[in-house]
């Protein structure tokens, strides 16, 4: 039988486990280890001897790798999960998406030239010495510059600037009102500088520049002339006509004037206004016709104050009614001293509206946002209806908003070098005649749709007759507001004449409420329904223009009240 193992084997004696019954000391011979025929294993000398705990659980950090074989110095480092994937294609690194709102920082020309020279030197050296390509330090390509891509969105600041100058606030210049402003300026110089009391009444349709002209002149006077106090009150904000006296006392700022009430307050105000010491007081009452009261005591008292002895009051009233002093205040005609100076503001003409719009837009830039044809079309439409400059400004501003929304919806990607500042760029899109026509049709269609038969928003027949009755009644009585009782009488007479069944008075009130929700009329409710005041919220010319477009309502207006 062949011999497979060496007959001489190494024997290793393991220490025996101590038992409780084993009390003998182990023999030294049993503990000896006899190794025969075993070649010694060469070991690598260890420079740093580090004592480690026996249990691997007690080892921390890199100590757990003490039993792993040592890596050769030429082995590559361990790759992460992201680097173990397939090789990527060559792409631009560090692309930045810059929005147009962020400031762009450009490198200075010298630094940019140095960077170009260094790039040329590197490229030339790489072509001359091919050995440098094998250098391990240059295996990775140099990091390329980050490409700046701008998401250029057309801001259109020209539209924003145009909307700012087309607002309804008091402008620096008021074209087409030089004559009226001259009359007001001379009146104030005469009475303020001469310390002479007086009264002035400004009349005209809405949007003709009455309040704007007076506000601009008062602002200029505060810088030039000292020694006067101006008080501006809008009578529409007052609860009643009698509330004007506490409002005046509060604006004067004297505590002793605010304590009394009723007639005592009026006496205190008269005493204060006729005192020898004190500055001149310019009292401006806008919407003065809202102070209409029983017997017109409030209006008579206000117009009589400037003519008291030693009075320091300069009263300026503003209202839409042309004949307020002649019709409502006939007693002022009897006393020549109490009659105020009258100044009427006529509606703006087509040429005046066009000149105002062009003057406003010329303050922004040379390239106007609105075409000249669009401006002329807007001026012609507004002057034919009311001559209200505020309506023309609103129409143009709304048309600019429509074009601006279209331009903002266009997002364009452009290189950074081609992006110019919005102020330097030309107008991307101008407001044309079609945009003005669209806005005017929307405004007229939302407010009045009386002449459209096949539209769902068209008014019913009874509401049309009620609007015709209100228009005819206000013209006959020459007042802005009528009671519901008088309106119902006029409505009933028109229905009888046109052979149309009329509704009762309670339903007439509900019809007025529906017209109020459409913005056609205004209601001032009272405890008694007959005393509810009804007024038109739209210009008479505008309503008449729409009502005449239909045969039935046109015949009612032509026939008038029976």
UniProtKB/Swiss-Prot annotation:
Gene: Cdc6
Post-translational events: Ubiquitinated by the SCF(CCNF) E3 ubiquitin-protein ligase complex.
Biased composition (Polar residues): 1-11
Subcellular location: Nucleus; Cytoplasm
Entry's family note: Belongs to the CDC6/cdc18 family.
Chain span(s) of sequence motif Cy: 94-101
Main location: nucleus
Function: Involved in the initiation of DNA replication. Also participates in checkpoint controls that ensure DNA replication is completed before mitosis is initiated.
Biased composition (Basic and acidic residues): 130-140
Protein name: Cell division control protein 6 homolog
Lineage: Eukaryota, Metazoa, Chordata, Craniata, Vertebrata
């Amino acid at each position: 039988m062949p011999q497979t193992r060496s007959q001489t084997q190494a024997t290793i004696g393991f220490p025996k486990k101590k038992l409780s019954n084993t009390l003998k000391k182990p023999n030294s011979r049993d503990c000896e280890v006899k190794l025969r025929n075993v070649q010694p294993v060469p070991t690598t000398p260890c420079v740093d001897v580090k004592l480690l705990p026996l249990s691997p659980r007690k080892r921390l950090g890199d100590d757990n790798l003490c039993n792993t074989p040592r890596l050769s110095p030429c082995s590559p480092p361990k790759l992460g999960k992201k680097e173990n994937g397939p090789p990527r294609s060559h792409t631009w690194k560090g692309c930045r998406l810059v929005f147009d709102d962020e400031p762009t920082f450009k490198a200075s020309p010298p630094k940019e030239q140095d960077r170009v020279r260094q790039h040329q030197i590197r490229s030339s050296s790489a072509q001359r010495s091919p050995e440098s390509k094998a250098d391990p330090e240059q295996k990775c390509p140099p990091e390329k510059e980050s490409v700046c891509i701008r998401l250029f969105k057309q801001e259109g600041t020209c539209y924003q600037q145009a909307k700012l100058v087309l607002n309804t606030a008091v402008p620096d210049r008021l074209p087409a009102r030089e004559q009226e402003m001259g009359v007001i300026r001379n009146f104030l110089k005469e009475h303020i500088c001469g310390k002479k009391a007086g009264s002035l009444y400004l009349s005209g349709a809405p949007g003709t520049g009455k309040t704007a002209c007076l506000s601009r002149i008062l602002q200029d006077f505060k810088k030039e002339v000292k020694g006067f106090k101006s008080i501006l009150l809008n009578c529409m904000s007052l609860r009643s006509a009698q509330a004007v006296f506490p409002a005046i006392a509060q604006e004067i700022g004297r505590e002793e004037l605010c304590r009394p009430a009723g007639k005592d307050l009026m006496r205190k105000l008269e005493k204060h206004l006729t005192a020898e010491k004190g500055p001149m007081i310019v009292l401006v009452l806008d919407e003065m016709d809202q102070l209409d009261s029983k017997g017109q005591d409030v209006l008579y008292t206000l117009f009589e104050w400037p003519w008291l002895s030693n009075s320091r009051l300069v009263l300026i009233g503003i209202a839409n009614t042309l004949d307020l002093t002649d019709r409502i205040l006939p007693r002022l005609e009897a006393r020549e001293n109490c009659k105020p100076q009258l100044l009427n503001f006529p509606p703006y003409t087509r040429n005046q509206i066009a000149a105002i719009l062009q003057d406003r837009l010329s303050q922004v830039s040379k390239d106007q946002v609105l075409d000249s044809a669009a401006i002329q079309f807007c001026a012609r439409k507004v002057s034919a209806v009311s001559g209200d400059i505020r309506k023309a400004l609103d129409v143009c501003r709304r048309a600019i908003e429509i074009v601006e929304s279209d331009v903002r919806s266009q997002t364009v990607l452009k290189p950074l070098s081609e992006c110019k500042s919005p102020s330097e760029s030309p107008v991307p899109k101008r407001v044309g005649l079609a945009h003005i026509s669209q806005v005017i049709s929307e405004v007229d269609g939302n407010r009045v749709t009386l002449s459209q038969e096949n539209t769902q928003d068209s008014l019913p027949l009874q509401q049309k007759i009620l609007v015709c009755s209100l228009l005819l009644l206000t013209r006959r009585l020459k007042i802005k507001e009528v009671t519901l009782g008088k309106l119902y009488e006029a409505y009933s007479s028109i229905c009888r004449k046109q052979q149309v069944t009329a509704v009762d008075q309670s339903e007439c009130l509900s019809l007025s409420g529906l017209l109020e929700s459409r913005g056609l009329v205004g209601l001032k409710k009272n405890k008694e329904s007959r005393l509810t005041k009804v007024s038109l919220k739209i210009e008479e010319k505008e309503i008449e223009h729409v009502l005449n477009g239909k045969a039935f309502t046109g015949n009612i207006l032509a026939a008038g009240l029976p």
